[in-house]
Amino acid sequence: MDYRNYDRGYAEPTMSASDYMTRTYRWMACGLLITFAMAYLTATTSLIYLVDSLYLVLTIAELALVFVLSSRVQTMSVGAARAAFFGYALLNGMVLSYYFFVFSASTLVMALLATSLYFGLMAVYGTTTHKDLTGWGPRLMMALVAMIITGFVGMLFGFGFGGSVLYCGIGLVVFMLLTAYDTQKLQQMYSYYSADAEMAEKASIYGALTLYLDFINIFLYVVRLMGNNRRRS
C-alpha cells in the first residue's frame, strides 16, 4: 500500500489517531483468533488429511490473497479488503495446523506468551520512539529476501537451514525489528488517510495485515527455537 502517492488534501481527520490504532489492533486480534482457532480445529480433526493433500494449493491461495490485498487495497471496497484479510487468516490457520499437530500444547502456549511479549515491546518502541525508522525498511526487506532464498536452497538440497537455531534466531530478530518499523509506518499512514474515512478504514485493515504477519512469524520462529532446545535436552 503506497500511501505516498495519495493526495490527502487538507480536510479534517475523520477519526482520531487512537481510534485508528485501536481498529488496527482489533482487526489484527480477530485475524489471529481466526488463525489459531482454525489451526487447532484442523490439527484435531480429519481436516489435517485434507491439508496434507492440498498443502501446495492452500499455500499458493494464501500468498495470492496477500498479494491482492497489498497491491490493490486502495481500489478495493472496505468489505472486500476485510474479506481478503479474514480469508487469508483462515487459510493460514489451515497451513499452520502442522505446528499444532507436531508441537505440544505447553510449547505452543509458552511460545504464544513469549511472542506477545516480544511483539508488544517492539510495538511500544515503534509507537513511542522519536527516531525515524524509515531507513530500516530496505535493510529488513533485504534480510528477509536473503532468508527466504537461504531457506529455499536449504529445503531444495536437504540442508535443513530453516530449522537451525541460527536461522530461527536471525528470523526472530528481523520480524521483531519489522514490528517496530510497521508500527511507526501505521502512524505515517494515518497522517495521510485520516481525512478520508474509507481510506483510513482500509489503511487500518492493511496495517492489521502487516502486524498480523509480524506476530505470526515471530511466533513460528519462537516455536522452532523451543523445539530445538527441547530436542537437545
Over which residues does each language-model region extend?
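A hydrophobic alpha-helical transmembrane-helix feature that marks the membrane cores
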Residues: 1-233
